[in-house]
């Protein structure tokens, strides 16, 4: 368990900023305590400093997980967000997509969102912008990348992909043995 290097911090913050923008500051400076990011086995954990101090006397090879896993670094040093970060990204999301009840199951099985399943989309969402996907009842389901801008979504045919799937809460069941 170690702090992130400058390069790792930059790469991770750039990825998170795609989803929450300048609200990233609210994630780091919280009123309920000091939180930090720590790297363990190529995974980045978001943990309070109080819990970090308590875990300091546990050896690294015995430690499985600490705090909330935000994502992991790939072998090519790219950062990939995990669905476990959804609870922290959803309240601060700048760009949101709401999907119809009929499209929820398809999204939760790992499929992209089609125009026919799109309920609403935040105004001024640009193409390839990170978005948080909600049900029509405002329950966060996952996150993805906008395949089309808000203006383009109005004109495309119903079978066109409007949001590329990145992660969803169905992964808790599909990949339960690998999530930490």
Curated annotation (Swiss-Prot):
Keywords: Nucleus, Ribosome biogenesis, RNA-binding. Its main location: nucleus. Residues 94-170 form the PUA domain. Gene3D superfamilies: 3.10.450.220, PUA domain (2.30.130.10). One of its GO terms (molecular function) is RNA binding. GO terms for cellular component: nucleolus; preribosome, large subunit precursor. One of its GO terms (biological process) is ribosomal large subunit biogenesis. It comes from the Eukaryota. InterPro entries: NIP7_N, Nip7_N_euk, PUA, PUA-like_sf, PUA_sf, Ribosomal_synth_fac_NIP7, UPF0113_PUA. Residues 1-92 are annotated as: N-terminal domain. Residues 93-180 are annotated as: C-terminal domain. It is found in: Nucleus, Nucleolus. Monomer. Interacts with pre-ribosome complex. May bind to RNA. Interacts with NOL8. Interacts with FTSJ3. Interacts with DDX24. Required for proper 34S pre-rRNA processing and 60S ribosome subunit assembly. Belongs to the NIP7 family. This is 60S ribosome subunit biogenesis protein NIP7 homolog. It comes from Rattus norvegicus. The gene is Nip7.
């Amino acid at each position: 368990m170690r702090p992130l290097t400058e390069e790792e911090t930059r790469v991770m913050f750039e990825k998170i900023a795609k989803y929450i923008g300048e609200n990233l500051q609210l994630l780091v400076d919280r009123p309920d305590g000091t939180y930090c990011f720590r790297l363990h086995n190529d995974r980045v954990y978001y943990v309070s400093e109080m819990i970090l101090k308590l875990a300091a006397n546990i050896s690294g090879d015995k430690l499985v997980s600490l705090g909330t896993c935000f994502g992991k670094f790939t072998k090519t040093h790219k950062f990939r967000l995990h669905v476990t970060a959804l609870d922290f990204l959803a309240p601060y999301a700048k760009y949101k997509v709401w999907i119809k009840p009929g499209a929820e199951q398809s999204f939760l099985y790992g499929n992209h969102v089609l125009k026919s399943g799109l309920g609403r989309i935040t105004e001024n969402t640009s193409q390839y912008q990170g978005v948080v996907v909600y049900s029509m009842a405002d329950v966060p389901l996952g996150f993805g990348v906008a395949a089309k801008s808000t203006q383009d979504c109005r004109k495309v045919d119903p079978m066109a992909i409007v949001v590329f799937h990145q992660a969803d809460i169905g992964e808790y069941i599909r990949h339960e043995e690998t999530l930490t």
